[in-house]
C-alpha cells in the first residue's frame, strides 16, 4: 500500500510540475503583445552534414499578425495576417498564398501567436529548465522532436531551437529585441512585386 501511495505522489508531482511549466511559458509568451527583432538562423542537416546560415528580421503583433523576412543569403518573406499566409521567394520571383495555417511543424515560430499559445498544453508536454528556458515535446506531431524556447533574465525572447524527426536542427537567435512596440496592422499585408509568379491556393476547391 505504501508503494502505491509513493508512486501516486511521484506521478502527481510530475503532472503538477508539467502544469506549472506550461503555465509559466504561456504567461511569458502572453506578455509579448508585440515584438520586433533581428535574427540569425542556423540549420544543421544531420543527413547531409550541410549547414545553412541565414539572417533577417521579424515582427509580430498579437493576436494574429506575423512577419518573417530573410535577407541573407536569399530574400524570402513569410507574412501572416490571421486570414492568409504569404510565402514569397525573391530569388524565384514566386509567391504562394495559403489559407490560414497554424502548422507549427512547418512554421514553429507561429507558437508565439495567441491562438497557438492557448493550445500549448494540448499540443505539447512542457518541461522547465533552470536557465529560463523550456523544452516542448509534441504529443502527436510526427515531424518535430522538440522545441526549446529560451528567454533572457528580463523575459525577452532569446532563441528558439527546433529538432525534427528528419535529423535536422535549427537554432534561431534573436537580437535587438523590442517588445510592446506600435506596429500598424497594414504592415502585415503583402503586395507582390511586378512580374511575380503567384500561386493562390486560397482559390482552390
Curated annotation (Swiss-Prot):
* Signal peptide, first to last residue: 1-19
Subcellular compartments? Periplasm
Biological processes per GO annotation: lipoprotein localization to outer membrane; lipoprotein transport
What keywords were assigned to this record? Chaperone, Periplasm, Protein transport, Signal, Transport
**Domain of life of the native organism:** Bacteria
Q: Which InterPro entries match?
A: LolA/LolB/LppX, OM_lipoprot_carrier_LolA-like, OM_lipoprot_carrier_LolA_Pbac
Q: Where are the transmembrane segments?
A: none
Q: Which Pfam families does the record match to this protein?
A: LolA (PF03548)
Q: Name one GO cellular component term.
A: outer membrane-bounded periplasmic space
Q: Which PANTHER family match?
A: OUTER-MEMBRANE LIPOPROTEIN CARRIER PROTEIN (PTHR35869:SF1)
The family classification in the record reads: Belongs to the LolA family.
What NCBIfam families does the record tag this protein with?
lolA
Provide the function of this protein.
Participates in the translocation of lipoproteins from the inner membrane to the outer membrane. Only forms a complex with a lipoprotein if the residue after the N-terminal Cys is not an aspartate (The Asp acts as a targeting signal to indicate that the lipoprotein should stay in the inner membrane).
Q: How does it assemble?
A: Monomer.
Identify the HAMAP family for this entry: LolA (MF_00240)
What is the protein name for this chain? Outer-membrane lipoprotein carrier protein
